[in-house]
């Protein structure tokens, strides 16, 4: 031990070491607090914000895809499967059928029926349209008009509601805002990649990764703090030990030279510690600046996504049920047919109306065709042709075959009496001319028209001419329609 170093000097070194150690411990405590704050901000707070953003983003994507499918399904169900289907049926089925009905009724109205064709005598001619149920047709038309008017009102109501309640809100708020939110979320993706790189050994850290740089620097600074604190603690322990040895007069040797050198270096060590502390505090400020630069954008993304999810929840709980209830009610109204027929529930009212109209068209078309091509010809045959033929046959028979047979029979009987009559007693019934069958009167039915005379005969001839002229016109019309 050097004689120049007394107990007072060593004691002063010990006090200096204690004071320096206490200052160092305070600085290290503050530095550790700063390190923990920086670490929390960079490895906990910021990642938690990003994780919250990730969770919200995944939920947002799921809800958006779900509501997009529901919105499209509602659009197809309401517009394509119900409204457009009924509208197409109306334009391609019902309207052509009504046009055909108008056409055939027009033909019936244009087809004159001479008064002599009617059982009851009438002064004026009528048309075929006078013999169809126009009241029933008009009632059917009114029912169709009522249905189509209601269909148009419901179509406008459903279309407007679908647009206002589902399509427009989802497009403006759901889709447009969703796309903007996605862009905002994509802006924080580079930060996520930087944080992911810190916990991944897949690729070396980028020198531009501020978070990684700060954490790496702070880890080195923390090690330096520990090293300095250990050195100061060790120096203090040695000084304390030296004081104890000097005061106790023990024989244990103390390297006072080392203590002296260490004591002289304490201000520099403390200065170095302050420098490390300042760097740590500065890193905390840098970290806070980094957080302040990025947290607002992350929080904006989170707030935007929460707002978007709130819209989606409201959309699911209010808008969708509203349109579905309206759709169900309107569909029941549109599919309820005023016509009770065996068409079955699978047929729409428009299809049932169309079937009914087509049946009328078929019946009236047959009515017109039969009248033009069958009835007039058959009527002429039964009223004129056949009676004449029958009368001709009857006249020929009476005046030819039957008359000849009567003459032959009369001559035969006369010859027989001449030859055999004298041999038969007069008390016997003798054959002769007195009981020969003869026609004294011919009674016929259905030949009155062809047997008329005078004015009646002239009128009958006129009717036949009119009938033949009408038949000719009908046949010409049939040929024109064929060609």
From Swiss-Prot:
Q: Which GO terms describe its biological process?
A: autophagosome assembly; autophagy of mitochondrion; piecemeal microautophagy of the nucleus
Q: Look up keyword Membrane and say if it applies.
A: yes
Q: Which InterPro entries match?
A: Atg17 (IPR007240), ATG17-like_dom (IPR045326)
The record's disulfide annotation reads none
- One Pfam family for this entry, by name? ATG17_like
Q: Does rRNA-binding show up as a keyword for this record?
A: no
Where, subcellularly, is it found?
Answer: Cytoplasm; Preautophagosomal structure membrane
What Gene Ontology cellular component terms go with this record? Atg1/ULK1 kinase complex; phagophore assembly site membrane
User: Which keywords does the record carry?
Assistant: Autophagy, Coiled coil, Cytoplasm, Membrane
Q: Which GO terms describe its molecular function?
A: molecular adaptor activity; protein kinase activator activity
Q: Which residues form a coiled coil?
A: 136-161, 206-235, 446-483
Q: How does it sit in the membrane?
A: Peripheral membrane protein
Q: What does this protein do?
A: Autophagy-specific protein that functions in response to autophagy-inducing signals as a scaffold to recruit other ATG proteins to organize pre-autophagosomal structure (PAS) formation. Modulates the timing and magnitude of the autophagy response, such as the size of the sequestering vesicles. Plays particularly a role in pexophagy and nucleophagy.
Name the family the entry cites: Belongs to the ATG17 family.
PANTHER family on file? AUTOPHAGY-RELATED PROTEIN 17
Q: What is this protein called?
A: Autophagy-related protein 17
Gene source species: Scheffersomyces stipitis (strain ATCC 58785 / CBS 6054 / NBRC 10063 / NRRL Y-11545)
Q: What is the lineage of its organism?
A: Eukaryota, Fungi, Dikarya, Ascomycota, Saccharomycotina
């Amino acid at each position: 031990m050097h004689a120049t170093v007394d107990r007072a000097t060593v004691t002063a070194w010990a006090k200096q070491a204690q004071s320096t150690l206490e200052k160092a411990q305070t600085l290290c405590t503050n530095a550790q607090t700063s390190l923990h704050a920086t670490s929390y901000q960079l490895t906990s707070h910021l990642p938690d914000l990003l994780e919250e953003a990730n969770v919200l983003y995944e939920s947002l994507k799921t809800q958006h895809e779900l509501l997009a499918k529901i919105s499209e399904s509602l659009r197809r169900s309401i517009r394509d499967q119900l409204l457009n289907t009924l509208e197409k049926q109306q334009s391609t089925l019902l309207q052509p059928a009504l046009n055909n009905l108008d056409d055939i009724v027009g033909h019936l109205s244009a087809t004159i029926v001479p008064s002599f064709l009617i059982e009851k005598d009438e002064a004026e001619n009528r048309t075929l349209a006078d013999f169809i149920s126009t009241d029933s047709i008009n009632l059917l038309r009114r029912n169709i008009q009522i249905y189509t008017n209601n269909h148009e009102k419901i179509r406008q109501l459903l279309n407007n509601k679908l647009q206002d309640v589902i399509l427009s809100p989802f497009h403006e708020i759901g889709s447009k805002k969703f796309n903007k939110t996605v862009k905002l979320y994509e802006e924080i993706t580079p930060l996520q990649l930087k944080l992911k790189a810190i916990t991944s050994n897949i690729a070396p850290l980028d020198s531009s990764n501020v978070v990684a740089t700060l954490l790496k620097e702070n880890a080195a600074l923390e090690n330096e703090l520990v090293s300095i604190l250990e050195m100061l603690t060790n120096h203090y322990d040695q000084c304390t030990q030296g004081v104890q040895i000097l005061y106790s007069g023990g024989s244990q040797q103390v390297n006072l030279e080392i203590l002296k050198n260490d004591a002289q270096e304490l201000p520099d060590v403390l200065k170095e510690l302050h420098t490390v502390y300042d760097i740590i505090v500065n890193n905390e400020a840098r970290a806070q600046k980094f957080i302040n630069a990025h947290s607002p954008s992350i929080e904006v993304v989170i707030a935007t996504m929460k707002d978007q999810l709130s819209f989606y929840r409201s959309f699911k709980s209010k808008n969708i049920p509203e349109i579905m209830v309206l759709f169900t009610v309107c569909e029941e109204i549109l599919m309820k047919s005023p016509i009770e027929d065996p068409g079955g529930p699978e047929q729409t009212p428009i299809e049932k109306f169309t079937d009914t109209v087509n049946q009328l068209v078929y019946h009236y078309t047959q009515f017109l065709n039969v009248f033009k091509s069958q009835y007039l010809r058959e009527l002429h045959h039964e009223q004129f042709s056949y009676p004449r033929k029958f009368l001709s046959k009857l006249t020929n028979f009476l005046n030819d075959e039957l008359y000849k047979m009567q003459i032959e029979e009369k001559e035969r009987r006369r010859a027989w009496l001449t030859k055999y009559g004298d041999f038969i007693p007069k008390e016997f019934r003798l054959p002769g001319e007195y009981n020969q069958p003869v026609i004294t009167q011919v009674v016929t039915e259905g030949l009155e028209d062809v047997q008329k005379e005078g004015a009646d005969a002239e009128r009958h001839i006129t009717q036949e001419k009119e009938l033949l002229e009408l038949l000719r016109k009908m046949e010409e019309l049939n040929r024109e329609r064929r060609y």
